[in-house]
C-alpha cells in the first residue's frame, strides 16, 4: 500500500519543519524550515552539541548575535546537504518591528550562506508578517533575496505579503485552531469544529483561494500542524511544512489521500480583494482578535527563545 505521505507528495511539496537534521533523510522532503525555537531544541540534544561547540569556538571573539547567525548558517548548511531544495532561516524576532534592521539581517544571512558556498536560490529568509516585516520583504525580494513570511494568521497579512512580492507565506494552522478551541471552551465540538471546519484549515484554504483567484505568484505553505488530519485537509496546497513526528505518522498511515485544494477550483471562490495600505493592514489585523493575539504571542515566544540561545552560547564561551 502507498503511504499517506507518498500520496500527499503527489499533490503538495512536502517540507520538514525541524532543526533536527538527522531525522530528515528518511522522509525525503523537498525543503526544510527552521525557527529559533527549533534550533534551541536541537542544540540541547547531545547529537548537536559538537556542532554548537565547534561554532561557538570558531567565532568566540564575535558578539553573541553574530555567533547565533553562524549557528543558524551551520544548521542550514547541514540541512542543505540532505535536501534537494531550500532551507528557511529566520531573522531574529526582536527585529519584527524594524524594517531597516530586518533588511540588513536578511542581507547578512545571505552573505554568510555565500561564504559557505550556498547560493541565495537555496535559502528563504523568514520574517514575521508585521507591517515592518512585509516592507523588509519587499526590499529584499527586489534584490533577489527570497522571503518566507511567518507568523501569519490572517487574510490581511497574506494579501499584504502577496502585494509586496514575497516568495512564500507560512499561514499557521495549529495555532489558529488552538485559539478557537481555547476560546470556545466546553462549547467546542471536535466532530463539528474539526476536520474541514477546522478554523486553521479554513484560514489557509481562504488564503490559497485568494492567491489563485487574483493570480499572485507567492507560494502558500501551510504550517504549524497539530494532527495528520489537518495536513490531509490541505492536500493540494503549494507546500506544507510538517514536523518529524507528524511526518512519521503520515509515513505509517495508508489512509487514502484526496486532493482538497486546486488552482482551478480556487479561481471561482467568492472572495473580495483586501486593501493593503498601512492603515487598512493595521486595522484589519487589529480587528481580528485571534490574529492580533497570536502574532504578538508568536513574536514574544521566538524572541524569548533567542534570548535562551544567547545565554546558552555565553555559557560556552
UniProtKB/Swiss-Prot annotation:
It comes from the Bacteria. Pathway: Carbohydrate degradation; pentose phosphate pathway; D-glyceraldehyde 3-phosphate and beta-D-fructose 6-phosphate from D-ribose 5-phosphate and D-xylulose 5-phosphate (non-oxidative stage): step 2/3. Its EC number is 2.2.1.2. Keywords: Cytoplasm, Pentose shunt, Schiff base, Transferase. Transmembrane segments: none annotated. One of its GO terms (cellular component) is cytoplasm. One of its GO terms (biological process) is pentose-phosphate shunt, non-oxidative branch. It is found in: Cytoplasm. GO terms for molecular function: transaldolase activity. The keyword Transferase applies. It catalyses: D-sedoheptulose 7-phosphate + D-glyceraldehyde 3-phosphate = D-erythrose 4-phosphate + beta-D-fructose 6-phosphate. Belongs to the transaldolase family. Type 1 subfamily. Transaldolase is important for the balance of metabolites in the pentose-phosphate pathway. This is Transaldolase. It comes from Paraburkholderia phytofirmans (strain DSM 17436 / LMG 22146 / PsJN) (Burkholderia phytofirmans). The lineage of its organism: Bacteria, Pseudomonadati, Pseudomonadota, Betaproteobacteria, Burkholderiales.
Amino acid at each position: 500500500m502507498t503511504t499517506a505521505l507518498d500520496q500527499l507528495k503527489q499533490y503538495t511539496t512536502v517540507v520538514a519543519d525541524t532543526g533536527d537534521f538527522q531525522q530528515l533523510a528518511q522522509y525525503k522532503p523537498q525543503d526544510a524550515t527552521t525557527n529559533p525555537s527549533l534550533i534551541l531544541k536541537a542544540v540541547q540534544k547531545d547529537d548537536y552539541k559538537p556542532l554548537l561547540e565547534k561554532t561557538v569556538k570558531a567565532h568566540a571573539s564575535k558578539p553573541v548575535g553574530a555567533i547565533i547567525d553562524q549557528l543558524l548558517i551551520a544548521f542550514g548548511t547541514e540541512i542543505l546537504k540532505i535536501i534537494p531544495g531550500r532551507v528557511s532561516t529566520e531573522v531574529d524576532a526582536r527585529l519584527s518591528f524594524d524594517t531597516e534592521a530586518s533588511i540588513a539581517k536578511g542581507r547578512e544571512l545571505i552573505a554568510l550562506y555565500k561564504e559557505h558556498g550556498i547560493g541565495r536560490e537555496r535559502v528563504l529568509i523568514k520574517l514575521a508578517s508585521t507591517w515592518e516585516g512585509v516592507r523588509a520583504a519587499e526590499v529584499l525580494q527586489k534584490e533577489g533575496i527570497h522571503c518566507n513570511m511567518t507568523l501569519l494568521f490572517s487574510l490581511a497579512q497574506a494579501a499584504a505579503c502577496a502585494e509586496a512580492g514575497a516568495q512564500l507565506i507560512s499561514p499557521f494552522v495549529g495555532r489558529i485552531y488552538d485559539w478557537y478551541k481555547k476560546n470556545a471552551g466546553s462549547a467546542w465540538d471536535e466532530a463539528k469544529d474539526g476536520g474541514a471546519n477546522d478554523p486553521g484549515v479554513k484560514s489557509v484554504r481562504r488564503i490559497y483561494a485568494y492567491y489563485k483567484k487574483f493570480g499572485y505568484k507567492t507560494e502558500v505553505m501551510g504550517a504549524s500542524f497539530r494532527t495528520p488530519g489537518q495536513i490531509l485537509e490541505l492536500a493540494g496546497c503549494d507546500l506544507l511544512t510538517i514536523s518529524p513526528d507528524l511526518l512519521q505518522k503520515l509515513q505509517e498511515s495508508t489512509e487514502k489521500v484526496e486532493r482538497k485544494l486546486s488552482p482551478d477550483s480556487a479561481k471561482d471562490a467568492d472572495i473580495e480583494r483586501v486593501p493593503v495600505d498601512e492603515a487598512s493592514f493595521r486595522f484589519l489585523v487589529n480587528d481580528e482578535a485571534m490574529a492580533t493575539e497570536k502574532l504578538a504571542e508568536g513574536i514574544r515566544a521566538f524572541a524569548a527563545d533567542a534570548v535562551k540561545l544567547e545565554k546558552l552560547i555565553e555559557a560556552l564561551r
